[in-house]
């Protein structure tokens, strides 16, 4: 709460990776069907949305602008939607892999290990709808590359993280714009103008602009 009060006092947002440590319990993929069928340790959805819920309450109390990074659960989407409807300065972001994949796509391969993990099909569909209707305003890559060796130890032993910088736009264009879920203009807005607006960076491409 104190951090939000201080941020609000200087007109800056709080940006959060939402994760309740006590709920992780050593998990490394989504606590879903694949996890249980293959004997892995799961990360429950509550570990994300519980912090989103808490932080939104604090944002309401303090008047702080609040931005949620890499949203992956349908519950987080609904909390952000309600906060926006209540007029709070709350925004959210997700990443291409949460819009295009789910835990049904998992393989015994470290390339499928990231944090937050790939969630269930319902979460993916909720995120797609949220990006389409503007509840989730930003798509970012959460680009986190590792060496081939670091990603070669299977789901349990590989480092967390997925690459996305090079392929984010073409994948989103192919699987969201071409089928009609987003227009090209909306995709560009989610990936460029919206984050500039949220973080007070101005708009457009001009000399001297960040």
What are these regions (language model features)?
Residues 37-63, 112, 133, 137-139, ...:
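His/Asp/Glu-enriched, well-ordered alpha-helical/loop segment
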Residues 1-139:
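Histidine/acidic residue-rich metal-binding segments in metalloenzymes
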């Amino acid at each position: 709460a104190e951090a939000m009060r201080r941020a609000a006092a200087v007109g800056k947002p709080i940006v959060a990776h939402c994760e309740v440590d006590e709920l992780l319990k050593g998990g490394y993929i989504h606590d879903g069907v694949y996890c249980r069928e293959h004997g892995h340790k799961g990360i429950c959805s509550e570990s994300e949305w519980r912090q989103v819920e808490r932080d939104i309450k604090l944002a309401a109390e303090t008047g702080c602008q609040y931005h949620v990074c890499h949203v992956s659960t349908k519950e987080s989407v609904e909390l952000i939607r309600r906060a926006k409807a209540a007029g709070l300065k709350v925004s959210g972001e997700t990443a291409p892999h949460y819009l295009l994949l789910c835990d049904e796509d998992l393989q015994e391969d470290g390339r499928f290990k990231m944090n937050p993990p790939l969630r269930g099909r319902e979460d993916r569909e909720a995120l797609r709808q949220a990006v389409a209707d503007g509840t989730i305003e930003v798509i970012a890559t959460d680009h986190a590359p590792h060496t081939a060796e670091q990603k070669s130890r299977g789901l349990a032993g590989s480092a967390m993280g997925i690459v996305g910088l090079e392929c984010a736009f073409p994948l989103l264009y192919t699987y969201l714009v071409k089928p009609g879920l987003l227009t090209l203009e909306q995709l560009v807005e989610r990936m460029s103008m919206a984050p500039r607006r949220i973080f007070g960076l101005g708009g457009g491409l001009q000399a001297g602009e960040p």
